[in-house]
């Protein structure tokens, strides 16, 4: 389910109409099929535009096994080389239900970060970095720890992407015990044209919600929006109540918050909780709308919901209805309506 514009699998049985008329964008690679089916069961149209491809380096089972070993025998030092890699590690541990013992094992350790992004990810996880390499180089980090002395110390080294930078070997050479953890590697978007189209469409109001399942994916998608100079337009859609940004957990939400969004974050960091939160938002009267004599009116990308009933509308019909809604019952000239089209 990494391909193009749409619509993973239409065979999912519909169990509610809470998302009828909603077009939801998934800029995700991991478990997108599962998420698509869950949203379609509530009547949503789903589009896929993966911002990244995950290239497994060591699988989640291996990462979790090594993390369990750290919980059982906590490290003296934790080396965090990248913000995205550390976030990915925390997300994997959270999904495995091990977050609390994992953080408890890391908290007493000396935590060192290779630059401000790594420090930010450490802080978002509720931990504190004891030292940060201002040059953002592994060489500075290595020099600092070797000068402090690491003989006999148990060191957890989080790697990401391009490998170890020689850290494991340098620490082992002076008598440290190294637990090496490579989270996963990110490859480029499988279809950059679809990714570019998705950020432009978001700025033009074509989506009701965008769901993020990883911090690296969120960073990459927002980076694409920034590069195409459409990020302000996407922020405007959210501010107007026409776009819901949602993230599976606070780590994933980090890049969205940094960019100025106010994402919906479920209480539990699970895909099922994310889907339920989105269904509750649109199906429970929490989406932007107005009260009318005929009941509550809410706009969707595919039409309007009036008193809980979905009414399909053309784009022109939606544009006119949107202008009238914003007028709040005030009179509108024909010219003003035409200018909105």
Put a short name on every predicted segment.
Residues 1-306, 315:
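Conserved beta-alpha
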Residues 310-341:
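Short amphipathic alpha-helical recognition elements used for nucleic-acid or partner binding
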């Amino acid at each position: 389910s990494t391909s193009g514009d749409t619509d993973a699998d239409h065979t999912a049985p519909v169990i509610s109409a809470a998302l009828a008329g909603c077009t939801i964008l998934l800029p995700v690679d991991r478990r997108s099929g599962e998420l698509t089916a869950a949203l379609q069961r509530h009547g949503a149209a789903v589009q896929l535009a993966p911002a990244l491809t995950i290239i497994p380096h060591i699988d989640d089972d291996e990462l979790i096994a090594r993390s369990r070993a750290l919980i059982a025998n906590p490290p003296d030092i934790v080396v965090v080389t990248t913000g995205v890699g550390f976030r990915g590690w925390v997300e994997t541990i959270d999904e495995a239900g091990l977050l609390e013992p994992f953080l408890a094992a890391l908290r007493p350790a000396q935590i060192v970060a290779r630059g401000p992004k790594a420090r930010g990810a450490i802080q978002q996880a509720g931990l504190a970095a004891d030292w940060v390499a201002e040059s953002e180089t592994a060489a500075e980090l290595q020099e600092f720890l070797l000068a402090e002395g690491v003989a006999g110390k148990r060191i957890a080294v989080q790697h990401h992407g391009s490998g170890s930078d020689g850290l494991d070997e340098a620490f082992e050479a002076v008598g440290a015990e190294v637990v090496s953890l490579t989270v996963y590697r990110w490859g480029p978007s499988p279809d950059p044209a679809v990714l570019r189209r998705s950020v432009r469409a978001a700025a033009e109001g074509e989506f009701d919600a965008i769901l993020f399942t990883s911090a690296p994916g969120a960073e990459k998608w927002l980076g694409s929006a920034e590069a195409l100079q459409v990020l302000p337009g996407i922020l405007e859609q959210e501010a107007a109540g026409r776009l819901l940004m949602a993230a599976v957990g606070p780590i994933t939400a980090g890049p969205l918050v940094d960019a100025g969004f106010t994402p919906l974050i479920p209480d539990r960091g699970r895909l099922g909780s994310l889907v339920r939160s989105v269904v509750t938002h649109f199906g429970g009267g929490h989406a932007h709308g107005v009260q009318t004599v005929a009941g509550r009116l809410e706009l969707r990308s595919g039409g309007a919901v009036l008193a809980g009933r979905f009414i399909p509308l053309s784009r022109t019909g939606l544009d006119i209805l949107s202008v009238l809604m914003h007028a709040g019952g005030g009179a509108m000239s024909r010219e003003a309506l035409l200018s909105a089209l």
